[in-house]
């Protein structure tokens, strides 16, 4: 491959997970003419995760959508399922293996974008000026395979994060042979279960997330909101208990684990001087989860990452510097902060809060809120669905005082009690239908 004058590459991408691969693939697919090197410490990719998002049919990742649902369900433990549906939008599921393969195929077809696996990146610092490189331009990255120089660096590496809450989950895609009791969670046939079996205690919210993939297979996750990250083994125990309660106990002859996934997502990320962050170096942009890709109140990030990768690649193709994720609009940021502070202040009421929004907010309004498209009327509907006083008390910003680092607190997981059966799945009465101009 040709070498960019004065640098090893125009752009070096640190970390080739979802965000790093998305940007590299966009640049490989386009015709920017930039020399790009993406490095990652992993030596290969596995089917270790999946991503979901709401969308219509008109997006360029449609070929790798493995499954979609036109209805999705919320349910408080023991209560009826509340089914949501929005015309023209589906809840779409992308397997990690398919996304990795798609991105790598685009990269491998390019003669100017290169993926280097098994390479650990270290310090990032500014380059000294030279005859061909003016002062203030250029970055050098120390890696396990030697130094790399570039005009710009996009750093997507994961790092320790301070946040108000952590969304800890453990999931298994299982072949259950048709034994999974979705009715116990109020999930109707053909629907996904986003937050079902919701229950809360003094430590926070727990719920079961179920994506039926066929008549005999499903992804089942146990999720816990916690002030600190939880031990993977303890969250996994909650997942196993949920599977057993739903009629698909691991180890049973009719149940086979196809793959597993787990993670910890920061909710209400708070910048901290002690955070493991890239120093402020000209030409360096932080992106991915560490750069604010995840929505504070939900943890959703895949669609936001794809939008950022597209915008960043377009800027680079025009000869402009890369960009990070756009800052959250003031109102959205404050609503998410107030909501998360309320979850911290009254963890035992969190299931009630989510159930109230599912019952009291029209599906199209709630969906726009979750996908960063909320209108003022949507925000007012969200506010009206929740109890006033607990949220008014959270108007003062306490996020920094509440933020916890990602140091583990192993004492916060509680055993998952048996799932109580729900009444027959039903579509609960919703607010008056929105007019066409409200939904458009």
Where do the language-model regions lie?
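Redox-cofactor binding/interface segments in oxidoreductases and associated redox assembly factors
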Residues: 14, 155-156, 286-288
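Flavin-binding catalytic cores
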Residues: 228-261, 285, 306-329
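Beta1/beta-strand and adjacent pyrophosphate-binding region of the FAD-binding site
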Residues: 2-19
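Conserved mid-domain beta->alpha element of the FAD-binding
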Residues: 270-343
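N-terminal FAD cofactor-binding segment of flavoenzymes
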Residues: 22, 26-79
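Predominantly flavin-linked oxidoreductase catalytic cores and closely associated redox partners
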Residues: 26, 109-255, 268-273
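Conserved N-terminal/central alpha/beta ligand/cofactor-binding core
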Residues: 56, 62-108
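C-terminal helical "tail/cap" subdomain of flavin- and related membrane-associated enzymes
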Residues: 310-440
């Amino acid at each position: 491959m040709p070498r960019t004058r004065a640098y090893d590459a125009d752009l070096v991408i640190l970390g080739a997970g979802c965000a790093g691969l998305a940007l590299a693939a966009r640049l490989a697919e386009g015709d920017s003419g930039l020399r790009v090197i993406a490095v990652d410490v992993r030596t290969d990719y596995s089917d270790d995760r999946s991503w979901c998002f709401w969308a219509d049919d008109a997006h360029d990742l449609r070929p790798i959508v493995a499954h979609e649902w036109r209805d999705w369900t919320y349910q408080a433990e023991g209560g009826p399922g509340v089914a949501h549906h929005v015309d023209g939008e589906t809840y779409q599921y992308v397997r990690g293996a398919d996304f990795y393969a798609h991105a790598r195929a685009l990269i491998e077809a390019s003669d100017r974008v290169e993926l280097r696996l098994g390479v650990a990146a270290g310090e990032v610092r500014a380059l000294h000026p030279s005859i061909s490189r003016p002062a203030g331009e250029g970055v050098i990255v120390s890696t396990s395979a030697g130094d790399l120089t570039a005009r710009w660096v996009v750093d997507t590496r994961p790092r320790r994060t301070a946040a108000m809450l952590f969304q800890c989950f453990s999931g298994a895609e299982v072949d259950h042979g048709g034994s999974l009791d979705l009715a116990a969670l109020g999930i109707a046939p053909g629907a996904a279960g986003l937050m079902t079996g919701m229950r809360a205690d003094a430590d926070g919210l727990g719920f079961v997330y179920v994506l039926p993939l066929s008549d005999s297979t499903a992804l089942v996750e146990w999720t816990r909101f916690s002030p600190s990250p939880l031990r993977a083994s303890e969250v996994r125990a909650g997942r196993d208990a949920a599977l057993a309660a739903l009629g698909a106990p691991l180890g049973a002859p009719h149940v086979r684990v196809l793959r597993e996934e787990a993670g910890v997502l920061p909710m209400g990320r708070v910048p901290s001087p002690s955070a493991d962050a890239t120093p402020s170096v000209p030409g360096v942009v932080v992106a991915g989860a560490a750069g604010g890709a995840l929505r504070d109140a939900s943890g959703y990030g895949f669609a936001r990452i794809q939008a950022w990768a597209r915008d960043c690649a377009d800027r680079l193709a025009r000869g402009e510097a890369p960009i990070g994720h756009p800052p959250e609009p003031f109102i959205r940021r404050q609503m998410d902060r107030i909501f998360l502070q309320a979850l911290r202040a009254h963890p035992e009421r969190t299931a009630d809060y989510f159930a109230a929004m599912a019952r009291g907010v029209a599906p199209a309004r709630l969906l726009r809120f979750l996908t960063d498209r909320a209108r003022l009327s949507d925000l007012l509907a969200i506010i009206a669905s929740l109890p006033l006083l607990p949220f008014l008390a959270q108007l003062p910003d306490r996020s920094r005082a509440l933020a916890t680092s990602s140091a583990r607190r192993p004492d916060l997981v509680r055993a998952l009690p048996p799932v109580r059966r729900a009444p027959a799945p039903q579509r609960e009465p919703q607010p008056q239908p929105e007019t066409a101009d409200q939904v458009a």
